[in-house]
From Swiss-Prot:
One of its GO terms (cellular component) is cytosolic small ribosomal subunit. This is Small ribosomal subunit protein uS2. The keyword Membrane does not apply. One of its GO terms (biological process) is translation. The gene is rpsB. The keyword Ribosomal protein applies. GO terms for molecular function: structural constituent of ribosome.
């Protein structure tokens, strides 16, 4: 009989196991290709946490070290393990016919949220989350209907309207499309079948709160400053890096695609086939700051040799 994931991951919150039925998912075979190599996780910078003063105590089990005025380091081995479980959860839900809503309104998440949601025919919110998207469905559906009517009129070049009226309608349509394009499919999806995938539960706290009220399961990235109980299942990782978010969300999208017989882009692929985006300059500055803290931490604890510090192909030992 196959071992269960609950035997493999002893640190999973019992609440997560109960809500998401982790015990039903077979454990990985240690001889198989990892979902993402530790080297690739390092390259993506998933291990960068926040300053120790900003941490959330419930994330302690996923951190290598706590030191005041320094940066927390997330254990990449646990990130890898939890990402594997999250992949299997999403794949299992997709096989059972669940629909997904990708949520990431911070700039580092926008592109990957849109791309992977479109790729998997999922709903997404990458701009401002409109209050009541899930809890005041009638209002949202009314706006969607208005947008559809305007799109039909636009297809006919707003025939019968004056130039001034056309400009007003075009402006109204553009605004509606900006806010609602990603949730067009919401009108055809019963909320009980939705699973939310969120890049930052703190940034998108309203979305998380609404999902909670409607009983929608939530899988999300939990950085060192995030209360993991905000989501039903958390993946400990850096939520401020384009590379980190792209890596994790592409893997989750791979699970949906795999369940439908589609191609996997990152999950269980070789490192050379996983191309990550370049981080913007502002992120690079933040990364350099975190690198300095990590290098100091590594040398103090002799976790890595000086010649190994911060090289992408270096493994961090817990």
């Amino acid at each position: 009989m196959e071992k269960l994931v609950t035997q493999q991951v002893q640190n999973v919150d019992p609440k997560q196991s109960e809500i998401l039925n982790i015990s039903e998912i077979p454990a990985e075979n240690p001889t198989e290709t990892p979902i993402i190599s530790k080297q690739k996780l390092l390259e993506a910078g998933v291990y960068f946490g926040h300053k120790a003063s900003q941490w959330h105590p419930k994330m302690a089990q996923f951190l290598l070290k706590k030191k005041r005025n320094e940066t927390h380091i997330i254990d990449v081995l646990k990130t890898q393990k939890m990402l594997e479980i999250a992949y299997k959860l999403v794949e299992k839900f997709a096989q059972k016919g669940a629909k997904f809503i990708f949520v990431g309104t911070k700039k580092q998440a926008k592109k990957v949220v849109e791309e992977q949601a479109v790729r998997t025919n999922s709903i997404y919110v990458s701009g401002r989350w409109l209050g009541g998207t899930l809890t005041n469905n009638r209002t949202i559906l009314s706006r969607l209907k208005t947008m559809e009517n305007l799109e039909k009129q636009a297809a006919e070049n707003f025939q019968g309207y004056t130039k001034k009226e056309k400009l007003a309608k075009q402006k109204q349509l553009a605004k509606l499309q900006k806010n609602l394009n990603g949730i067009k499919g919401l009108k055809d999806v019963p909320l009980f079948s939705l699973i939310m995938l969120v890049a930052d539960p703190l940034k998108d706290a309203i979305a998380v709160k609404e999902a909670r009220k409607k009983g929608i399961k939530i899988i999300g990235i939990t950085d060192s400053n995030v209360d993991p109980s905000l989501v039903d299942f958390g993946i400990p990782a850096n939520d401020d890096s384009t590379k980190s978010i792209t890596l994790i969300f592409t893997v989750l999208a791979d699970a949906i695609a795999s369940a439908k017989g589609g191609k996997k882009l990152f999950a269980y692929q070789s490192d050379e086939n996983i191309i990550l985006p370049e981080d913007p300059e502002k992120e690079l500055k933040q990364t350099r700051y975190r690198n300095n803290s990590f290098e100091k931490f590594a040398r103090q604890k002799n976790t890595l040799k000086d010649s190994q510090v911060l090289k992408p192909n270096t493994e961090i030992q817990a």
